[in-house]
Amino acid sequence: MAKHSHDHTHDHHDRPRRVRKPGEPLRIGVGGPVGSGKTALVAAICRQLRDELSLAVLTNDIYTTEDADFLRKHAVLPDSRITAVQTGGCPHTAIRDDITANLDAIDDLIAAHDALDLILVESGGDNLTATFSSGLVDVQIFVIDVAGGDKVPRKGGPGVTFSDLLVVNKTDLAPLVGADLKVMARDAEAVRDGRPTVLQSLTEDPAATKVLDWVRSQLAAAG
């Protein structure tokens, strides 16, 4: 991957939120445990916004490019607008502790595509503690699903507690796993200090309407 000079630093620790310059794309991180539905959500956002905005996607996997390959296979964006970072270690390291590879990949996307409006940065699957460096993304979505039971929001963790949007995914499976969606919504509200939570099923709502509304609100606020 090409290397570039940056006017931002490559910290090994989180720093205050980056300041977006005029014309820079909004960067939204999408994180969450393995199998929670991150890639499917990214695909849904791309399908809904690709005709009205200039988009790109950056995925993170440990040893493969599987998530990027999935997005290309399903043609959610042109291939050149989807790229991957192979982290080679703990997934959270590349999105939080040493974000150099992700910053380089973002620079490559910006250089290849004029006037990008939005870059979605998907993390590799990790646990409830994984969050993005504020030097990498402007806002972040954290995706959990009902398969782990309705106790997951109650367990908290930085992703659940501090993400800008929490998504409780695969709600259509709740009856099959005995998860109480009202309990999940209540517990999420209790730990999130007013930050929004969305309960959704991409099976029932393939457009991810509530998440899409939130993404559009972030784009509008970014100007």
From Swiss-Prot:
| Region described as Disordered | 1-31
The record's annotation in Gene3D superfamilies points to: P-loop containing nucleotide triphosphate hydrolases
One of the entry's Gene Ontology molecular-function terms is: GTPase activity
Q: Which domain of life is it from?
A: Bacteria
Primary residence: cytoplasm
Q: Where in the cell is it found?
A: Cytoplasm
Q: Which CDD domains match?
A: UreG
Q: Which UniProt keywords apply?
A: Chaperone, Cytoplasm, GTP-binding, Nickel insertion, Nucleotide-binding
Matches recorded under InterPro entries: CobW/HypB/UreG_nucleotide-bd (IPR003495), P-loop_NTPase (IPR027417), UreG (IPR004400)
Protein residues bound to GTP: G32, P33, V34, G35, S36, G37, K38, T39
Write out the function statement from the record.
Answer: Facilitates the functional incorporation of the urease nickel metallocenter. This process requires GTP hydrolysis, probably effectuated by UreG.
Subunit and interaction comment: Homodimer. UreD, UreF and UreG form a complex that acts as a GTP-hydrolysis-dependent molecular chaperone, activating the urease apoprotein by helping to assemble the nickel containing metallocenter of UreC. The UreE protein probably delivers the nickel.
Against HAMAP family, the record matches this protein to: UreG
Which family does this protein fall into?
Answer: Belongs to the SIMIBI class G3E GTPase family. UreG subfamily.
Q: What is this protein called?
A: Urease accessory protein UreG
Q: What is the lineage of its organism?
A: Bacteria, Bacillati, Actinomycetota, Actinomycetes, Mycobacteriales
